[in-house]
Amino acid sequence: MNKKETSSSYSHILKYTSIFGGVQGLVILIGMVRNKLIALLLGPQGMGLMALFNSTVRLISDTTGLGLGVSAVRELSRLYDEEHHEELKSRIELIRSWSVITACLGFVLCVVLSPLINHYSFSWGNHTLHFMLLAPIIALTALSAGELSILKATRKLRRLAEISIYGVLCALVTSVPLYYIFGESAIVPSLIIIALSQFIITITYSFHYYPYRVHFDSATFSEAKPMLRLGISFLGAGIMGSGSDFIVRSFLNYEGSLDDVGLYNAGYMITMTYAGVIFSAMETDYFPRLSSVGNNVEERNLLVNRQLEVSLLLISPLLILLMSTLPIALPLLYSDAFLDVLPMVKVAIFAMFMRSLELPVSYIALSRGDSKVFFLLEMTYYLLFITMFWLGYKNAYLFGIGLGLVVTGLLFNLILYAFAYQKYSFCISKRMLLYLAIQLFLAGLVYFISSNSNTLLSWSIQVAAIVASSCFSFYILRNSISGIFKRK
């Protein structure tokens, strides 16, 4: 098999999507157990409070991270592929030095801004001290992100999988007992313990491959300029993402209550996180390979289209199954107190189909280092997201939020694909459009039937649709892989 086939073949994409999808599935399964226990112990209000703290951590981490998580992977991946070992070690030392700088910056900024964050997040009580105590989490997150970028760029895929599994196991065994004993008072301490355990696990692996070295001199700043220039553009995109996340949760807390925040967070977790298991291989495997393609338009289009096909075919049966079983799955995953979010989740599942179309194409600008393009696309998405979120909530409560997510995905994909065609000569294959039409038809059928009937006939039709989606995906993927091996 030549290099082109290796990097863009269905077998390679399916292999690593399955590996990381399987690992992420295990991680999510353990996370489900943890979330179930936390939901029972804290309820929607406690889950809402935790969501606000987590969105604050993400916002400050993205603001002070300087986009190093993305620019470092791109830089190190190139050196690793070209086997420039000495330069690679030097760059790793540079990235670690800047991880320390961003960790300190995040710590200080969190402490300084805590009164302001408290003012805009809560209309009641004083949580300034709680926000200050998030500072160590932000510092540890920055240090962990630097080490993870090194492992991603140098293709330590198995180790990354192990880090994910051990991290979520530590979160389970440390946080649940604290919530059981102390209730909501344990939220911030448990978040600190989770961040610390994740950091220890990560450095245990990364230090094994590349011993820890840092330096702080004039070269630390001069050598990092190209990487920082690229990273700062990604920084803006990251701030918009975590900022919009923070805005919508704060908006829900002000306009509604912490219960609304908890319900929304549960719905978001089920759709965007649990159903996003298939996308876990994107950043770890797909992005480095796409970065190595360079300016070869034909190979890039082949790789992106195949990633689109595999992602859609793998995720569609899972989404249709989730849609059908939501009335049963939602109380099992959380509790009966979260059933009010069912209408939102059901319609928001269609946003995941949009997500499967969006991610592989969005990574083109990222892989090319077109920071301005990436920034503008991200800004467009989050402006659409906040607008549709506000309109949806004001007009149809939680169901409106779910519908807003779908409309956001649809409008953004139209913009994204038109731009990708104009800028990068990317064109989606007719075969991919056919697959999408079939899977969307089956999903629409299940949505309509499950929303309007609860008879034996309706359940039979839903089961038939799930089986049809699964068999169709299996047939296409099997034939695609067989065709590659026949051509060898």
Label each region the model flagged:
Residues 93-122, 172-173, 180, 278, ...:
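Alpha-helical transmembrane segments of multi-pass membrane transport and lipid-handling proteins
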Residues 128, 132, 161-209, 226-230, ...:
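Hydrophobic alpha-helical transmembrane segments
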Residues 66-82, 153, 210-211, 267, ...:
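Helix-loop junctions and terminal segments of transmembrane helices
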Residues 15-27, 53, 62-115, 129-130, ...:
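Membrane-water interface segments that mark the loop-to-transmembrane alpha-helix transition
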Residues 139-163, 185, 349-381, 420:
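Membrane-interface junctions at transmembrane-helix termini in multi-pass inner-membrane proteins
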Residues 1-13, 202-245, 285-302, 423-437, ...:
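Interhelical loop/hinge segments that connect adjacent transmembrane helices in multipass membrane
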Residues 2-5, 447-488:
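Membrane-proximal transmembrane or re-entrant/amphipathic helices at the cytosolic face
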Residues 16-32, 47, 167, 191-198, ...:
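Transmembrane helical elements of multi-pass membrane transporters/channels
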